[in-house]
Amino acid sequence: MSNFVFYDFETSSSNKQWGQIIEIGAILTDDDLNELDRFESRSRLSPGIIPEAMALIVTNTSPKKLKTTNLSHYEMIRQFVEKLKDWGKVTFIGWNNIEFDQIFLRNTLFQNLEYPFNSTTNGNNEGDILNLARAANL
């Protein structure tokens, strides 16, 4: 079986085309859900990005905090891409990730000149716990 990556993004906006991923949390597990590794990173807001007020409330952050983080958005994405390469073939799991996080990730990877379809190619898969919960509620 495959290893799993459980992940979540905090973003500056609900707009998947114009917002920015500001924080990444990801945990690699084996197929018995034993934690093997983790990735946690936060970046400062890129110039020209204006965060939505509701996004600041949901992510429990402030404009000041978004400006004072040392890591640039590009550096954070590069580190995440390298971590994913280290982890190899995985199944990406999240809550509402197919409709939100994966679209944000694809747009972000494309904007940073990285391959945008890593979660569905090269032996990788994706799953959405929200869809599982919806199916269980039928």
Positions of PLM-derived features:
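Conserved non-catalytic scaffold segment of RNase H-like nuclease domains
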Residues: 2-108, 119-120
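Short, surface-exposed basic-aromatic patches at helix termini and helix-loop junctions that form
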Residues: 110-114
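Short alpha-helix plus adjacent loop in nuclease-associated cores
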Residues: 124-138
